[in-house]
């Protein structure tokens, strides 16, 4: 947690923000993103919401702050993030409205009116895409709403990309796989799920990554004191630059 606390924004959100004007702070851009995810289809009183992939709880806490009559369950497979979110739930007195659950989504049971999935699909792995959508259908109530934010790769690049291991898969997210827009449309259609694209955020992701890289380098001495090497610094800078270049 300490590593990410040094260079992420105040909400500790490790996914793209949404820059409407380009002049927002990183924290403001993350809150824009949260608002965009629910705009036009806001949670209703009494909704029981599931978030798959809690991170440090920023989206779940945002929802609870805006909608006082909902409940949220959020899943994680990170013990550190579980401990962090659990402590914050107690600190904010939200035990009756929010649960953080240390569990793989494939093992979870329940019925939810809304399910959110923010930049976790990339880590599912192509061999589990159908398993993932099967589970979403099982957990979602009839007429429920499923919303996700994911990184995609151009349709024309997908087949070549899927046949090899790139830098991200080797060093950052082993087993990960980006979908393409056509692949997402296909799997949504096969699973009888509605599909629409709300926001395309390539420029926002570029800005997010550039701010992360700036923050990382400004805080490097503190990060180094946590036990990270100069070799790690070079690798992390390459990772952030590699990704930001991909969104330009």
Regions found by a protein language model. Name each.
Residues 143-151:
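Conserved beta-strand signature within the Rossmann-like core of class I S-adenosyl-L-methionine
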Residues 106-115:
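A short acidic, Gly/Pro-enriched loop at the edge of an enzyme's catalytic core
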Residues 65-106:
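Class I SAM-dependent methyltransferase SAM/SAH-binding core
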Residues 45-55:
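Conserved class I S-adenosyl-L-methionine
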Residues 152-248:
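Substrate-binding/catalytic lobe of Class I Rossmann-like enzymes that use SAM or dcSAM, i.e.
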Residues 130-142:
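A short glycine-rich, Lys/Arg-flanked "PGG" loop and its adjoining helix->strand segment in the class I
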Residues 56-68:
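Conserved SAM-binding loop of SAM-dependent methyltransferases across substrates and taxa
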Residues 1-40:
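Conserved Class I S-adenosyl-L-methionine-dependent methyltransferase catalytic core
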């Amino acid at each position: 947690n300490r590593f990410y606390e040094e260079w992420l924004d105040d909400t500790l959100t490790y996914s793209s923000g949404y820059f409407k004007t380009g002049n927002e702070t990183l924290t403001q851009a993350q809150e824009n993103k949260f608002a965009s995810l629910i705009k036009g289809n806001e949670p209703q009183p009494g909704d029981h919401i599931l978030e798959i992939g809690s991170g440090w709880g920023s989206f779940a806490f945002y929802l609870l702050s805006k909608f006082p009559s909902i409940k949220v369950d959020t899943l994680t497979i990170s013990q550190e993030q579980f401990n962090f979110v659990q402590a914050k739930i107690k600190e904010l007195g939200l035990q009756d409205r929010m649960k953080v659950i240390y569990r793989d989504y494939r093992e979870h049971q329940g019925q939810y009116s809304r399910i959110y999935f923010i930049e976790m699909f990339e880590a599912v792995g192509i061999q589990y895409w159908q398993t993932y959508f099967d589970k979403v259908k099982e957990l979602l109530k009839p007429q429920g709403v499923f919303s996700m934010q994911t990184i995609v790769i151009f349709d024309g690049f997908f087949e070549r990309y899927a046949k090899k291991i790139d830098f991200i898969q080797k060093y950052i997210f082993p087993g990960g796989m980006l979908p393409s827009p056509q692949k997402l449309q296909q799997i949504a259609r096969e699973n009888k799920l509605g599909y629409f694209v709300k926001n395309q955020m390539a420029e926002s992701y570029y800005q997010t990554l550039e701010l992360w890289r700036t923050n990382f380098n400004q805080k490097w001495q503190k990060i180094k004191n946590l036990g990270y090497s100069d070799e790690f610094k070079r690798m992390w800078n390459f990772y952030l630059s590699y990704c930001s270049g991909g969104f330009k």
